[in-house]
Amino acid sequence: MKAPVRVAVTGAAGQIGYALLFRIASGEMLGKDQPVILQLLELSNEKAQAALKGVMMELEDCAFPLLAGMVGTDDAEVAFKDIDVALLVGARPRGPGMERKDLLLENAKIFTAQGAALNKVAKRDVKVLVVGNPANTNAYIAMKSAPDLNPKNFTAMLRLDHNRALSQLALKLGKPVGGIEKLVVWGNHSPTMYPDYRFATSDGASIGDAINDQEWNASTFIPTVGKRGAAIIEARGLSSAASAANAAIDHVRDWVLGSNGKWVTMGVPSDGSYGISEGVIFGFPVTTENGQYSLVKDLPIDDFSQKYIDKTLAELEEERSGVSHLLG
């Protein structure tokens, strides 16, 4: 049997955590032969800690053969001790009447502290995925707060946007989603992100040629993907927790086990490619192998695409400047 992998999940008793933990413990994220130890972080208030205890009881009651141990805590340094993978799900949600900049600052406090704790106690090759919104900027804050860790260890989740775009293309084409490859989602995990199917294929045939409808792209496809989260809240009365958890599992699984040459979207620190300012955590097409990701380079960017990329980059740079005074 392999040695267990230590996986930390923050916000572990929340909606996404609840949709996530049982799938991790069953082996869906790291493989059916890989034992895991779950290190679960929740807020220190009594209600959150009681809810966490209940989730841990349920995990015990599943008798997962791969679940080699659990820790439940309100202390980030306990949760992050010697971890291999961190899923930073917990974040301050936007309250009524709260400005986006206030939300940024509230979350900056959380992710500064969590970045520092990762820096202090996590394994040096820890893989960090930030799910809690605003995910790109929260990942940037955590990365900047962990100067002893490689910036490439920090990623933000764009996979939900990627999966949403895949399903919209499959519906439009009337084809199974599994045959679609080479989709890209550029930018921020926000309504400004840009789903780009110019290079995408369905069973090897160009999707751009098959759809050939720029009006549909601009007025239906891009806004549908961008506003999907809001549409789900309106329909369900709750945010998209199960699909977010599913995307987190996809992201980490591909990062750890490899994407088999397929393009996937990850929010990663820019190396300056495509004119994106260095260090900004931005959605890019990547391939993954042996636990490392590589950017897909040198894709042509037309004027239509450049306009969208510029817009989402401007939003990210504005977010970054809004928290830069906290990062020294």
UniProtKB/Swiss-Prot annotation:
**Record-level GO BP terms:** malate metabolic process; tricarboxylic acid cycle
Sorted keywords for this record are: NAD, Oxidoreductase, Tricarboxylic acid cycle
Q: What catalytic activity is recorded?
A: (S)-malate + NAD(+) = oxaloacetate + NADH + H(+)
Q: Which InterPro entries match?
A: L-lactate/malate_DH (IPR001557), Lactate/malate_DH_C (IPR022383), Lactate/malate_DH_N (IPR001236), Lactate_DH/Glyco_Ohase_4_C (IPR015955), Malate_DH_type2 (IPR010945), NAD(P)-bd_dom_sf (IPR036291)
Stored Pfam families: Ldh_1_C, Ldh_1_N
Q: Which domain of life is it from?
A: Bacteria
Q: What is its EC number?
A: 1.1.1.37
Q: Where is substrate annotated to bind? A: R94, R100, N133, R164
Read off the CDD domains from this record.
MDH_chloroplast-like (cd01338)
- Active site residues according to the UniProt entry: H189 (proton acceptor)
According to the UniProt entry, its GO molecular function terms are: L-malate dehydrogenase (NAD+) activity
Q: Which positions does UniProt annotate for NAD(+) binding?
A: G11, A12, A13, G14, Q15, I16, G17, N107, Q114, V131, G132, N133
Job description of the protein: Catalyzes the reversible oxidation of malate to oxaloacetate.
Question: Which HAMAP family does the record cross-reference, listed alphabetically?
Answer: Malate_dehydrog_2
**Per the similarity annotation, which family is this?**
Belongs to the LDH/MDH superfamily. MDH type 2 family.
Q: What is this protein called?
A: Malate dehydrogenase
Origin organism of this chain?
A: Xanthomonas oryzae pv. oryzae (strain KACC10331 / KXO85)
